[in-house]
A protein has these predicted regions:
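A motif-centric feature for acidic-aromatic and gly/ser/thr-rich catalytic loops and repeats
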Residues: 1, 305-311, 536-595
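Intrinsically disordered, low-complexity Ser/Thr- and acidic-rich flexible linkers and loops
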Residues: 1, 219-231, 385-386, 411-418, ...
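Surface-exposed acidic, glycine/proline-enriched linker/cap segments
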Residues: 1-4, 77-113, 310-327, 403-424, ...
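A residue-level detector for well-ordered beta-strand positions
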Residues: 9, 30, 55, 119, ...
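Glycine-rich, acidic and aromatic/proline-enriched surface loops and short helix-turn segments
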Residues: 13-14, 206, 244, 401, ...
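Repeat-solenoid scaffold signature
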Residues: 23-110, 242-299, 330-384, 442-483
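Extended repeat-based solenoid scaffolds, especially LRR ectodomains
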Residues: 92-178, 305-321, 326-331
């Protein structure tokens, strides 16, 4: 029982955690130096790969290098080697050469390490080691210089080298520049795939940004950029604040388009957002709260949502006083009211939906749990002349990990959570507890990177997805393709889009999203600029969000109603009721959804 459900921690004589065991995972080992700095770490997947994660610090205790070493020494050996040594390093710059990237290697760990993130502080001498960094740029209306030798950059992060986990030889080179008050006034990035992003910032005397200029250079242009000043797109924001320092107006300019008042914000007496006027004040959104500050009503263009707790409840709703939502209604869902019931541990045990006249819609959901809070059963009903089960799902666990899910009813509905009972064990996990096989979803294998993010997903029908992450966790690209029958799918080798079976790629570079080599979307705080219809040019699209942050629709300047077809609708439990448009994958609670 302890091995299945327990969280186990082991400590050395100096009360440092040297081993940790989590449910469903192999142990994680930790190694420290004499100064109590964590210098090595190894989880279950690291052991299988024969590597240790390495952490190197300067003499001020700042982490300067994180990477891995391909040497699978036993845990006890590394403890013995490191525990009496001070393994801190310091920056010597170009005078020390490019060895260890300007830092002094003081131990075999430094020599063996393949770096994934390199941090530079205090000064800009690192630019003499790497030619890929972009220096300080001058733009009219923004700072024309930075303070390289001033005390203002002391203890500041001035540069970063961030590796692409799929191929650590490809890296982002990011530089940060500061003014005399230590405020970041400019950052430049030369990305692993060749994109370039520059950000320029002006501040008021209180330290709040009043204007931000973002420049972007694409890798999909017809000719290479002539210089670092040759950019493709410019996105400029201007900010105004009220007497309390709250954002009151947000202006935006995209390329050569006219400046637009994206949003005007108004607040109530206690500082809560009360009204929002968008796109040159042509559309109004209002927000209401109860005496506890909980949101009770959201009014957007073409969407009204009401949230109930313990007051003004519709019929058949049970009042709740602990912050749980008793029910809510949304005009996009035909003003149906969704009501919730919870157990004594605040777990959702049932949902019911009602029409405005109080009659029940036959889409109830029921849930049961085990003592650990794991979902054991899920029943869902729909009405087709008479009530029928859409799902009657039973889930079996080993510890807290799903091993098998069986559904007694199989519906043709797209999101009916179909669980074909194909084999005795549908789901498998790796040594870190990551899902590596799910036969219910035709997932044959998933390969993960060093930070436990999926790198390759292979499906049993020959389809393949490859994800590209930077070492700091940013997703920058995905590639997709289909392998013909009989073709071996090499999970460890599919790391670039030169593979003959890769049919397309998508790129993310900060605010810019590219699909198959074409700029498709530019995000901004209240929506996005759509470029799918090139005949119309850039098209502003504002989004309407519900109480959980999911996008329920969008509207364009001149619209009087909400377009909702690309965006998700879902059951009260959150299970989707329709497909999500692949061009808007982040519509569901801000999380990426792929199908």
């Amino acid at each position: 029982e302890v091995q299945l459900y327990g969280y186990l921690y082991y400590y050395d004589e100096r009360d440092r955690c040297i081993k940790k065991k989590l449910p469903g995972c192999e142990p994680i080992y930790y190694v420290y130096d004499r100064c109590n700095y964590l210098v090595l770490k190894q989880d279950g997947n690291d052991r299988e790969a024969g590597r240790w994660q390495s952490f190197q610090y300067d003499r001020l205790g700042r982490q300067v290098i994180w990477g891995f070493i391909n040497q699978n020494r036993p845990h006890a050996d590394w403890i013995r080697i490191c525990k009496n040594q001070n393994l801190s390093i310091y920056f010597r710059g170009a005078s020390y050469g490019s060895e260890n990237y300007g830092y002094t290697p003081v131990h075999r760990i430094s020599h063996l390490c393949t770096p994934l993130i390199i941090n530079y502080y205090d000064n800009y001498e690192y630019t003499t080691i790497f030619n890929e960094f972009i220096g300080f740029l001058n733009r009219p209306g923004y700072y024309s210089s930075f303070f390289a030798s001033s005390l203002t950059s002391r203890d500041k992060l001035t540069g970063q080298v961030v590796a692409l986990l799929n191929d650590p030889s490809k890296r982002d080179y990011i530089a940060y520049y500061y003014d005399q008050r230590g405020r970041e006034v400019q950052s430049t990035m030369n990305s692993a795939f060749g994109f370039r992003n520059y950000t320029f910032t002006n501040y008021d005397f209180t330290g709040q940004p009043v204007s931000v200029r973002k420049e972007h250079t694409s890798i999909y242009r017809d000719t290479p950029p002539a210089s670092v000043d040759d950019v493709d797109h410019i996105l400029t924001y201007e900010y105004e604040y009220d007497h309390a320092g709250r954002l009151s107006k947000l202006y935006q300019t995209y390329d050569n388009d006219a400046k637009i008042l994206v949003a005007k914000y108004e607040y109530d007496e206690v500082g809560r957002l009360e009204k929002k006027l968008t796109h040159n004040e042509t559309a109004t959104s209002t927000y209401k709260y109860n005496v506890r500050g909980w949101p009770t009503e959201i009014n957007e263009l073409g969407m009204t949502e009401k949230i109930y707790y313990n007051e003004d409840l519709p019929q058949k709703a049970t009042p709740l006083y602990n912050g749980n939502i008793a029910c809510f209604s949304n005009s996009i869902d035909n003003n149906y009211t969704s009501c919730f019931n919870y157990d004594g541990l605040n777990r959702l045990i049932s949902t019911r939906q009602y029409k405005p006249d109080g009659s029940e819609i036959f889409t109830p959901e029921d849930f049961t749990y085990d003592k650990m809070g794991n979902l054991l059963t899920y029943y869902r009903v729909y009405f087709d002349f008479y009530p029928r089960y859409m799902n009657k799902l039973t889930i079996k666990y080993h510890g807290n990990q799903i091993q098998k899910a069986a559904d007694d009813y199989r519906s043709v509905n797209y999101y009916s959570l179909r669980y074909p009972d194909a084999v005795n064990r549908d789901v498998e996990y790796d040594s870190n507890g990551n899902l590596v096989k799910n036969l219910d979803n035709m997932i044959q294998r998933i390969k993960y990177n060093i930070i436990n993010l999926p790198e390759v997903v292979a499906f049993s029908d020959g389809n393949l997805l490859t994800f590209y992450y930077m070492a700091d966790g940013r997703k920058v690209r995905d590639a997709y393709g289909s392998y013909p029958a009989g073709t071996s799918t090499p999970l460890d080798d599919i790391v670039n889009n030169t593979d003959p079976y890769i049919s397309g790629t998508n790129d993310w570079c900060e605010d810019y999203y590219y699909g198959s080599g074409k700029l498709r979307r530019v995000t901004f705080p209240e929506g996005h600029i759509s470029l799918y219809n090139n005949s119309k040019g850039p098209l502003m699209q504002y989004v309407a969000k519900d109480h959980v942050g999911s996008i329920r629709g969008y509207w364009e300047p001149g619209d009087t109603s909400l377009g909702k077809s690309p965006y998700p609708s879902y059951y009260p439990s959150g299970i989707l009721d329709n497909k999500v448009d692949p061009y808007h994958p982040f519509a569901l609670g801000g999380k990426e959804f792929m199908s």
